[in-house]
């Protein structure tokens, strides 16, 4: 089970209703953060999430509302005597920008902070999941991210076991660990006695972007597309390089992702006003508030939990 926790659903600046962007993905006790707007540490405290559980942080771009929460987060980790390395990923110039942040004030972390600059397209492999980076269109170097849970092996198939003249037993645990074993002089492979692989969850986070073909391509058949929708309509669009609700809904439909969540709401809207307007334009979309959670299990289902 993967848990997506919305720590900040607003954009540009905090409002009394919501904080600026940060999304946590919780998988088997590990926390991965996508963007760290100012105040993210406080949001984590309210959500009951420990900064010490964070192993990786992915920054979409270097506008303040997406990264200015980093110093407070890292200094708190240091105060709590963190020893485990922290890995931060982002677009070009990440090393310079984060180095400048860490050099400000009377502070130096006692643990390793490693910054990885990602090209416009990257695929990172970790033990239980992958993260893919792709370029979006925001007027500055900016990335969207795909979180992809690794596919899991299929269940043991008793019919296949029987057809090989075998009976269920302790050898199954050994086979699960080693993938290939020898029974009675015969080589048995795990793939011979299990069913089809179970597809892992796929979650896409766009960060800030105007309508972008890359989002459609990388969101193909995702369980969940988290797309920015700063404006309810094009008449409200002040600056460029952002998306309206209607545009985000159209991108979602083209991508054939199964579920859509809209975030990065402009500060001009109350939640009530935004939800009413967005629901008329895209009735199927989820409109999360800060601290709402979405539970994703494999490729099977998505549950939206309101705080």
Swiss-Prot record:
Lineage: Archaea, Methanobacteriati, Methanobacteriota, Thermococci, Thermococcales
MF terms (GO), sorted A to Z: 3'-tRNA processing endoribonuclease activity; zinc ion binding
Active site: 65 (proton acceptor)
Family annotation (PANTHER family): ZINC PHOSPHODIESTERASE ELAC PROTEIN 1 (PTHR46018:SF2)
Keyword annotations from UniProtKB, A to Z: Endonuclease, Hydrolase, Metal-binding, Nuclease, tRNA processing, Zinc
Positions of Zn(2+) 2 binding: 65-66, 208, 264
Quaternary data: Homodimer.
Textual note on the cofactor: Binds 2 Zn(2+) ions.
Protein name, per record: Ribonuclease Z
One family name in Pfam for this protein: Lactamase_B
EC number: 3.1.26.11
SUPFAM superfamilies linked: Metallo-hydrolase/oxidoreductase
Family: Belongs to the RNase Z family.
Cofactor or coenzyme needed: Zn(2+)
Its job: Zinc phosphodiesterase, which displays some tRNA 3'-processing endonuclease activity. Probably involved in tRNA maturation, by removing a 3'-trailer from precursor tRNA.
Cross-referenced CDD domains: RNaseZ_ZiPD-like_MBL-fold
Annotated catalysed reactions: Endonucleolytic cleavage of RNA, removing extra 3' nucleotides from tRNA precursor, generating 3' termini of tRNAs. A 3'-hydroxy group is left at the tRNA terminus and a 5'-phosphoryl group is left at the trailer molecule
Binding site for Zn(2+) 1: 61, 63, 138, 208
